């Protein structure tokens, strides 16, 4: 076999990685959380992908559209330091740690990594009715405790995030379990909810068939 043939075979076996694609094993918890909305996995989240992500989770069209506009317009510039304005409002997943807001739980550190002690603090401080779950009222009290009166944007963002989370992931008793809250931080809950919704839709279609 000639050297040229070996070289060609080597190239065929080692395709170049897709531009912007991230190595999931090396991603921080926050990057994994954000990457759920990177529907084509190119390392960038556009407004229509944010919309598609929220629709996949089961939100209505109007809410998904509003959230997509709010998130991408608000975070795009922060995740693209040194780059010019883009009317497409892209969010760079690898720089998602640059858009963390105040008035939150501090479960992510400055680099977007998961902080176990801060996570445990949520339930140690605020889970009064059940040690491993939060009621809607307890979530409201937690948000009030974390709120910085001079950080309106951060408080509104945190309120919206927890409101949507509770709506999508609460159990039949209206409780948000510790397991679900933990899974939201690395985005694994998103995948679980999408899979569950997809399965329900498939069963519904089968039942409608004559």
UniProtKB/Swiss-Prot annotation:
Family membership noted in the UniProt record: Belongs to the caleosin family.
Record's keyword annotation contains Calcium: yes
InterPro entries in the record: Caleosin-related, EF-hand-dom_pair
Tissue specificity note: Expressed in pollen coat.
Entry binding sites for heme: 33
Modified residues (Phosphoserine): 188
Function: Probable calcium-binding peroxygenase. May be involved in pollination.
Gene: PXG7
Designated name of the protein: Probable peroxygenase 7
Keywords of this entry: Calcium, Heme, Iron, Metal-binding, Oxidoreductase, Phosphoprotein, Secreted
Annotated residues for binding of Ca(2+): 38, 40, 42, 44, 49
Molecular function in Gene Ontology: lipase activity; metal ion binding; plant seed peroxygenase activity
Keyword presence, Methyltransferase: no
Reaction(s) this enzyme catalyzes, per UniProt: RH + ROOH = ROH + ROH
Intrachain S-S bonds: none
Protein source organism: Arabidopsis thaliana
Assembly, per entry: Homodimer.
A GO cellular component annotation in the UniProt record: extracellular region
Domain (EF-hand) ranges: 25-60
Record remark: domains: Transmembrane regions are predicted by sequence analysis tools, but these regions probably constitute hydrophobic domains associated to phospholipids. The proline-knot motif (81-90) may be involved in targeting to lipid bodies.
Cellular compartments annotated: Secreted
Region (Disordered), start-end ranges: 1-24
Domain of life: Eukaryota
Cofactor note: Binds 1 heme b (iron(II)-protoporphyrin IX) group.
């Amino acid at each position: 076999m000639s050297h040229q043939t070996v070289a060609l075979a080597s190239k065929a076996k080692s395709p170049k990685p897709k531009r912007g694609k991230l190595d999931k094993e090396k991603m921080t918890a926050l990057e994994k959380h954000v990457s759920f909305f990177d529907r084509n996995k190119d390392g960038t989240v556009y407004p229509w992908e944010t919309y598609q992500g929220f629709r996949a989770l089961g939100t209505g069209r109007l809410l998904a559209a509003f959230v997509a506009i709010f998130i991408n317009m608000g975070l795009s510039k922060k995740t693209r330091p040194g780059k010019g304005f883009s009317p497409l409002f892209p969010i760079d997943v690898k720089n998602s740690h640059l858009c963390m807001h105040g008035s939150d739980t501090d479960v992510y550190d400055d680099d977007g990594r998961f902080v176990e002690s801060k996570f445990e603090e949520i339930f140690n401080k605020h889970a009064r009715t059940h040690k491993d779950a939060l009621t809607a009222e307890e979530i409201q009290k937690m948000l009030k405790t974390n709120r910085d009166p001079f950080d309106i944007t951060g408080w509104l963002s945190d309120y919206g995030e927890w409101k949507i989370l509770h709506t999508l992931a609460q159990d039949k008793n209206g409780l948000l379990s510790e397991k679900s809250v933990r899974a939201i931080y690395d985005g694994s809950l998103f995948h679980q909810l999408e899979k569950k919704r997809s399965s329900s839709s498939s069963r519904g279609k089968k039942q409608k068939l004559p």
